[in-house]
Amino acid sequence: MATDDESFPWDQDSILSRDLLSALSPQLCYENLNRSCVRSPYSPGPRLILYAVFGFGAVLAVCGNLLVMTSILHFRQLHSPANFLVASLACADLLVGLTVMPFSMVRSVEGCWYFGDSYCKLHTSFDMSFCCSSLLHLCFISVDRYIAVSDPLIYPIRFTASVSGKCITFSWFLSIIYGFSLIYTGASEAGLKDLVSALSCVGGCQIPMNQSCVLINFLLFLVPTLVMMTVYSKIFLIAKQQAQNMEKMSKQTTRASDSYKDRVAKRERKAAKTLGIAVAAFLLSWLPYLIDSIIDAFLGFITPSYVYEILVWIVYYNSAMNPLIYAFFYPWFRNAIKLIVTGKILKQNSSTTNLFSE
């Protein structure tokens, strides 16, 4: 029988060997499951930074867009067909911040999906639907701005609340039908049986897109983009012409009606410029991701995971950009924020407050 002195070195070697094997073996999302996905966790420092960056984006998307919606829906002065479109756009971005970004944050930082297969599909459907809805809203907003700038006096008759409601309904209906049908019918995975099998592990949420779906996504992005670029090019030319006319008229005596028309045109051009910046930010956020999706679909998903995560979060952060753009360019939005934050919005008749400095 071995003595304690003889057995101790053997036990020590066993412990060291076990620790070495543990260090060399890959970490799993679920340690007790054989089909668990492998995770590649960050060290504590980078993890904290990533959580802070991604979490800030989610909070900004929710709070910022909630402020936009509250401002437009509460203050009667902002009740216009164009602003209802903006409020609906803010709703889409807010839902991205609520239902998509927090869960994607955990997946991106931890390298695992801990929210189940059912919510994985729902999460992806939300992602596609709300982002598609944002694009369609921006497209309709660009058309609205074109009508407003090209003929500001006739605009209220042409773009009514009814027209705005139809645009909003179409944007949401088409986006939700497309996003959910693509995921829940399995159309996105058709022809990718081997890849789907390779990605099937517990703790993963990767739904690959085949070439057909990637091309459809790109076309859904491209067509509204071309519409917006064409429309904003025309808006720029009209605004330039109006500015020249106003400069000429400023040297002459004008009637009151002409002066009113000039003020309206100036206000509409400023709104078009602000929303044009929002459109440009959207396109710059989405274009790298879509190009990468096409490259992956046709070259065998060659993009490194960290590059993919960066591109995805650039897209997500776009949902937080619009409130910042409005706050920078719209004095009425800054005034509304002050009233909301200070609690003055709760006072009686606060909805009739004049938010415009002019």
From Swiss-Prot:
Cystine residue pairs: 37-201, 120-205
Positions of transmembrane segments: 48-68, 84-104, 126-143, 167-187, 218-238, 275-295, 310-333
Residues exposed to the Cytoplasmic side: 69-83, 144-166, 239-274, 334-358
Extracellular compartment spans: 1-47, 105-125, 188-217, 296-309
This protein's GO CC annotations: plasma membrane
Keywords linked to the UniProt accession: Cell membrane, Disulfide bond, G-protein coupled receptor, Glycoprotein, Membrane, Receptor, Transducer, Transmembrane, Transmembrane helix
PROSITE patterns attached to this UniProt entry: G_PROTEIN_RECEP_F1_1, G_PROTEIN_RECEP_F1_2
Entry remark concerning the domains of this protein: In addition to the well known disulfide bond common to G-protein coupled receptor 1 family, trace amine-associated receptors (TAARs) contain an unique disulfide bond (Cys-37-Cys-201) connecting the N-terminus to the extracellular Loop 2 (ECL2), which is required for agonist-induced receptor activation.
Family the UniProt entry places it in: Belongs to the G-protein coupled receptor 1 family.
Protein's name according to its UniProt entry: Trace amine-associated receptor 7h
Lineage, uppermost ranks: Eukaryota, Metazoa, Chordata, Craniata, Vertebrata
Gene name in the database record: Taar7h
